[in-house]
């Protein structure tokens, strides 16, 4: 569940004593993403409300209502825009106040909608546009896809010749780190979204996203491990919480060649249905590249040969920038192509919400050295799709579709293992932008 926006949908328990003739607050839902969040208040009767934002990181929501809202404060992971929702001091005895604490500066808008005698007020909070990356980070220049080629990968250059960065420096790190993974197998890290105290989205029938994602992830791992081409590993194999950054770190420790993050969608519109697949946006790629350039001590951890090059280029920020730019470009191209294959397979299982890969600023897709996709398996907020997502049969069909999409891509683009037996090794794929390290 992601930036569209969601990462947790929480129904707060309401215990309210409505005034005679006043609207009654019946539900609170929170959709929390990295760059946008929505707080939806549902009322029986037409509400009176206001909002203010004295500081850019705290939003005050005032509603004409007496009583107590139980279940507050709501604590979030801190990886997305909303950090906390808590009760504030009301402006008068006839009001309630909610204070929304943000992880970064943002602006708030509100809209009221009516459905018969029921009303919803949707507060949308958008993060301020971040400052441009440091001057050392060059903006990637890309040509827009031609209208006659709607399925063209926007991250691919005009030709498919291999682009490489070579380092002739002495590298003391074990060169096996740059190998293709478990022998000749393609290592797929499978990330089951949410977990532990973070249930993810909760369907109208009570189905929790975290339970759906781990079930599909385990089925996908079984399919991959039954295929000699693959080795499937899980970022979590139980009901516990892992931070967004921690999920990428687990995949890197497993020498993953690719990461698939599995989620279930949710939306205030309960009629929304269908699967979608998301890839890293250019905006997030540029932002992450700036972060990696600043974290010299972590650069050597990168897989695929980039770590070997960066380990010996710390005195040359322009070389570091070039390597990371190539690595991000390569990961985006591979991610988009895999996403296209997975979507074509999901189309045979159920409906698609988006027929092309979508771009988003998602933390789990942030690694430059591990191409990745995020699969929204369907809308758990829709009654029909909730029942499907909770069924073992449909979970297996989703896992099968993801597996077939992965296999179709990697059968056509096999990972090339590093030669064994000496310190000078090469790690690359037959995709443009792969990194080559020659010692």
Curated annotation (Swiss-Prot):
GO terms for cellular component: outer membrane-bounded periplasmic space. It comes from Salmonella typhimurium (strain LT2 / SGSC1412 / ATCC 700720). Disulfide bonds: none annotated. This is N-acetylmuramoyl-L-alanine amidase AmiB. Its EC number is 3.5.1.28. It is found in: Periplasm. One of its GO terms (biological process) is FtsZ-dependent cytokinesis. It comes from the Bacteria. InterPro entries: MurNAc-LAA_cat, N-acetylmuramoyl_amidase_3. Residues 138-167, 415-439 are annotated as: Disordered. Transmembrane segments: none annotated. Residues 1-22 form the signal peptide. Cell-wall hydrolase involved in septum cleavage during cell division. GO terms for molecular function: N-acetylmuramoyl-L-alanine amidase activity. Residues 425-439 have a biased composition (Polar residues). PANTHER family: N-ACETYLMURAMOYL-L-ALANINE AMIDASE, N-ACETYLMURAMOYL-L-ALANINE AMIDASE AMIB.
């Amino acid at each position: 569940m992601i930036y569209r926006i969601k990462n947790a949908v929480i129904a707060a328990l309401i215990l309210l004593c409505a005034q005679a003739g006043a609207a009654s607050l019946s539900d609170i839902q929170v959709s929390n993403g990295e760059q946008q969040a929505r707080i939806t208040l549902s009322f029986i009767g037409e509400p009176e409300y206001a909002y203010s934002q004295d500081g850019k990181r705290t939003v005050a929501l005032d509603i004409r209502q007496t009583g107590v809202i139980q279940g507050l404060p709501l604590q979030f992971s801190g990886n997305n825009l909303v950090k906390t929702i808590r009760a504030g001091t009301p402006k008068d005895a006839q009001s309630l106040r909610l204070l929304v604490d943000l992880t970064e500066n943002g602006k708030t808008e509100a809209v009221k909608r009516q459905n018969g005698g029921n009303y919803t007020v949707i507060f949308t909070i958008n993060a301020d546009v971040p400052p441009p990356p440091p001057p050392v980070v060059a903006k990637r220049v890309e040509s827009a896809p031609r209208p006659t080629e709607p399925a063209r990968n926007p991250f691919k250059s005009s030709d498919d010749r291999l682009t490489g960065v070579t380092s002739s420096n002495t590298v003391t790190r074990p060169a096996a780190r740059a190998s293709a993974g478990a022998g000749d197998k393609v290592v797929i890290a499978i990330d089951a979204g949410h977990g532990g105290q973070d249930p993810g989205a909760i369907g109208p029938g009570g189905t929790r996203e975290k339970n759906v994602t781990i079930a599909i992830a385990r089925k996908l791992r079984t399919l991959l491990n039954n295929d000699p081409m693959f080795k499937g590993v899980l970022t979590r194999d139980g009901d516990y919480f892992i931070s967004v950054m921690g999920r990428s770190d687990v995949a890197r420790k497993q020498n993953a060649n690719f990461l698939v993050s599995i989620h279930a969608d949710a939306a205030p519109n309960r009629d929304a249905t269908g699967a979608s697949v998301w890839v890293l946006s250019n905006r997030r790629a540029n932002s992450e590249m700036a972060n990696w350039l600043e974290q010299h001590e972590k650069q050597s951890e990168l897989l695929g040969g980039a770590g070997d090059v960066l380990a010996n280029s710390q005195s040359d920020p322009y070389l570091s920038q070039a390597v990371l730019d190539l690595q991000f470009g390569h990961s985006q191209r591979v991610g988009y192509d895999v996403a296209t294959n997975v979507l074509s397979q999901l189309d045979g299982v159920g409906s698609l919400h988006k027929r092309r890969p979508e771009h988003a600023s998602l933390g789990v897709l942030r690694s430059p050295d591990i191409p990745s996709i995020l699969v929204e398996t369907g809308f758990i907020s829709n009654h029909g799709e909730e029942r499907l997502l909770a069924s073992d049969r449909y979970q297996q069909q989703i896992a099968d579709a993801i597996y077939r999409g992965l296999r179709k891509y990697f059968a056509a683009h096999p990972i090339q293992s590093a030669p064994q037996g000496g310190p000078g090794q090469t790690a690359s794929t037959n995709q443009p932008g792969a990194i080559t390290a020659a010692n």
